[in-house]
A protein has these predicted regions:
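Membrane-proximal juxtamembrane linkers immediately C-terminal to transmembrane helices
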Residues: 28-46, 86-87, 184-187
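Small-residue transmembrane helix packing/gating motifs
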Residues: 157-198
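A cross-kingdom feature of multi-pass membrane systems that activates on extracytoplasmic/periplasmic
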Residues: 195-220
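Short, surface-exposed ligand-recognition loops at beta-strand->loop->(often short) alpha-helix junctions
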Residues: 44-51, 195-199
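Alpha-helical transmembrane segments
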Residues: 5-7, 13-40
Length: 220
């Protein structure tokens, strides 16, 4: 009877610990909210900015879709940071559309003093990722080819790295229009989709069927 009592007590304690742990996980998830730009479906190209604009237009009109936004990318672009004569290397450039840029403000992702409004449209202003060791600052200029870009704002971290650190790499975020002007590339490397609350499996399948099989499709 004593052993049975101990076994029963141990089993009950295990259940209590499991439930407590589950509640703790939910609580942690609550404390760490998702970004306003978090996607439910990702479509990616392994061949650069190859996804056509028309695909976004097509998906935007489909059932179960709440928001569609795309990003373009250019890596290891020769650049010079004018405020730092010791920096003469390369930068990565990522384009954000208006929705993506607005999400940075919603998420309070920008450092104090940043002026997001300057980045919209075809401009000479960009955002830059940063961390505590970054040497660049708001107001610095970046020379890319014949273009001079001014850093209008800094992100509090680097959302493109696993640990949020820049690791000394300067990454610029531009508007759609600015990216196209600088690179001449209009296609996307990544398309992100937010679905509606009542999206069905059939809706998701229809979206996938509209995507060229040469692109990767990830339903989260």
């Amino acid at each position: 009877k004593k052993n049975l009592f101990l076994m029963t007590g141990s089993f009950a304690l295990s259940i209590i610990l499991f439930l407590s742990f589950s509640v703790m996980i939910d609580f942690v998830d609550y404390l760490i909210p998702q970004s306003a730009a978090t996607s439910d479906i990702d479509i990616a190209s392994d061949d650069g900015n190859a996804i056509p604009r028309e695909l976004l237009t097509s998906i935007r009109a489909m059932d179960g879709v709440r928001e569609v936004y795309g990003r373009r990318s250019a890596f290891d672009v020769p650049a010079r940071l004018n405020s730092d004569t010791g920096f003469s290397g390369t930068t990565d450039m990522i384009s954000y559309d208006d929705f993506d840029l607005q999400c940075l403000k919603k998420d309070s992702a920008l450092k104090r003093g940043s002026d997001l409004s300057k980045v919209f449209g075809d401009s000479n202003f960009v955002l830059a990722t940063s961390d505590q060791d970054s040497t660049w600052k708001i107001g610095d200029t970046v020379q890319i080819g014949d273009e001079t870009l001014t850093i209008a704002g800094l992100l509090k971290n680097d959302p493109f790295s696993e640990n949020g650190s820049t690791n000394g790499k300067l990454t610029l975020i531009t508007s759609d229009e600015t990216f196209v002007r600088l690179t001449g590339e209009e296609g996307y490397s990544l398309v992100l989709i937010q679905t509606t609350g009542d999206v069905t499996d059939e809706n998701v399948q229809a979206i996938q069927n509209s995507v060229d099989q040469t692109y990767s499709f990830r339903d989260k």
